[in-house]
Each structure stands twice: as C-alpha cells, then as structure tokens.
Amino acid sequence: MTIPPLALVRQTIPQPVLADAPGEIRRLIQSSGLSQRVPRGGTIAVGVGSRGVHAIASMARATVDTLKAMGYRPFIVAAMGSHGGATAEGQRQLLAEYHVTPESMGVEVKTEMDSLVLGKSPVGLPIYFDANA
C-alpha cells in the first residue's frame, strides 16, 4: 500500500471574548420575551453541560440569578449524555468539579437520568430532555 503525500494543515478557530459575559447573559435573558411565555413564579430548568464552556459556573450562576430576579424558580439539570459514566451520581460529581453545586448556585441541581422526547429535529431525529424539566 502506498501512502499519498501529506500536508500540514492548521486551522485557527475564532474565539470572541465578551468583556462582561454575565451581563450579556442577563441582557439576553431579559430581552428574550420569556416573561410573555412563562408566568412569574414558574419553574425553569437550566441545562448545564460538560462540553468545554469557559467559566461555566459563573455563566450558570448568572443565568440562575437573572431568572430569580425575574420572579422565576430555576433549577439546574445535567445536560450531558454519557459524561459522568452516564449515571446520575457521575454527572452530579462532574458538575461539582465545575463548581456547579446546590450551594454554589443557590438552587437545586437535579441529575436523574429519566428523559422525555420533546419533539423532533428538522431532520426527524428525536430531541430528548431531562424529565424533571
């Protein structure tokens, strides 16, 4: 077998920086029209995953704090599949490693593995989400 000639390829992916990411999160949530779709006092699940979000704990906390300030009762759900060994306890531990805990977030963190199909994607694939949500 002959190996064809190889060439070095380098890709630089742009990584924009937000000067005030928590402030941008607040602005986006407040301008999202959420209050027209969910009544004050309603519960809202905040999905927190494990796929390389920089400063994920501060992003999650900004989301939770904004929702609380708007009169909602947020809680966090693990938004990951096989990470954490695909177990509730493993995902709870993984979130804790990212400093996402009930104590640090000020809300409940639910990592049960039960999920429901919410609908289908434009290409017909099922969309699953945490049953607690």
Predicted region positions:
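Glycine-rich phosphate/diphosphate-binding loops that line cofactor/substrate pockets in enzymes
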Residues: 29-45
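N-terminal amphipathic/basic leader segments beginning at the initiator methionine
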Residues: 1-25
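Short glycine-rich or small-residue beta-strand-to-loop segments that form or flank ligand, phosphate
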Residues: 43-52, 75-82
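Active-site histidine-anchored catalytic micro-motif
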Residues: 70-92, 104, 111
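An acidic, phosphate/nucleotide-engaging active-site surface
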Residues: 90-133
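Histidine-anchored nucleotide/phosphate-binding helix
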Residues: 54-73
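Short glycine/serine/threonine-rich phosphate/pyrophosphate-binding segments
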Residues: 53-60, 85, 117-125
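Short, well-ordered amphipathic alpha-helical segments that serve as non-catalytic structural scaffolds
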Residues: 22-32, 60-63
